[in-house]
Amino acid sequence: MAKEKFDRSLPHCNVGTIGHVDHGKTTLTAALTRVCSEVFGSARVDFDKIDSAPEEKARGITINTAHVEYNSATRHYAHVDCPGHADYVKNMITGAAQMDGAILVCSAADGPMPQTREHILLSRQVGVPYIVVFLNKADLVDDAELLELVEMEVRDLLSTYDFPGDDTPIIIGSARMALEGKDDNEMGTTAVKKLVETLDSYIPQPERAVDKPFLMPIEDVFSISGRGTVVTGRVERGIVKVQDPLEIVGLRDTTVTTCTGVEMFRKLLDEGRAGENCGVLLRGTKRDDVERGQVLVKPGTVKPHTQFEAEIYVLSKEEGGRHTPFFKGYRPQFYFRTTDVTGSCELPEGVEMVMPGDNVKVSVTLIKPIAMEDGLRFAIREGGRTVGAGVVAKIIA
């Protein structure tokens, strides 16, 4: 059967759920698709389908990033359900990087928890511009004062990480109720409708970087028999059209290829645009020639680099960072876009050590080249744990 063309009539916006494990992110994601299917006619996606990676069943926690889509009155939303569990921060980083706005799900019964804080911090790090809060499980809280207290705590936490806590919209409701089609005290379907209206009004229509040269970080690589190699990711900027020449940059020698097809949500497109999650079919590129962590770019626009100066912030112990200082020659992993690369740090003259909670300028030398430009953000990690954040200030080599 021929694939149907993707409907572009509504403006497109990327959102996603973040928050502590078991606070109801996946339930809310399913509830959003249910309510939007009834009100605006987009497709419904069941909880089990969103929560479907094999490991997730055993532990009841979401591990991989699930993509769903739904429509509001004015927009088409692509929604990622970000993993909540601390072990999967790596996916959280790639997931949250794909958002024009995030829905922070916080249980009204429990209040903010360690991962609530960590995900707000990560959102700040990876540049999520807007956060809307859904105070979930409100049907389990009888005390209005307690709800008010939790709301204040969440607002304080947002302000701590430079989000506008006082002005952030907070919707109070029950995702489970909405998923079951109930609406007692307007906490179910009505609350989720209100959430969608808030997404429409509070998250401005993102200005897409479509006029800049094409760049897409590669998240995954597939081989499709008879058609070739497909790379998937979110187009960071620009447009890719069928027959465009492209370069694959980073981690190894730069290679040249051609786009022979673009698809999104299993539908064929003539082009992929900034802000969209899509698959790009590459001519003459073997499955083993390309890997996650490389980028697909317009030829000649981005170069791979291994040495740069960066301004970094080292998380304090309270923020879940290191408990001890580090010294020159420190070798953590630097997480750029979709992958970790080990690098060593040189400290400025006169600086002997860097304490948790400090910010400092460092010179970094990576063991593999990364497609890089000034202003590129990264996370600093040790054995899977985020210990800092940084931004490329100046490329050296």
Curated annotation (Swiss-Prot):
First-listed, main subcellular location of the protein, grouped into a coarse class: cytoplasm
NCBIfam families named among the record's database cross-references: EF-Tu, PRK00049.1, PRK12735.1, PRK12736.1, small_GTP
The family this protein is said to belong to: Belongs to the TRAFAC class translation factor GTPase superfamily. Classic translation factor GTPase family. EF-Tu/EF-1A subfamily.
G5: annotated segments: 174-176
Keywords: Cytoplasm, Elongation factor, GTP-binding, Hydrolase, Magnesium, Metal-binding, Nucleotide-binding, Protein biosynthesis
The reaction(s) this protein catalyses: GTP + H2O = GDP + phosphate + H(+)
GO cellular component, one term: cytosol
Residue ranges occupied by any tr-type G domain in the UniProt entry: 10-207
Enzyme Commission numbers on file: 3.6.5.3
Annotated spans, G4: 136-139
Residues at which GTP binds: 19-26, 81-85, 136-139
Protein name stated in the entry: Elongation factor Tu
Any one GO molecular function term: GTP binding
Keyword Nucleotide-binding applies: yes
Residues reported to bind Mg(2+): 26
Annotated stretches, region: G3: 81-84
Region (G2): 60-64
Subcellular location: Cytoplasm
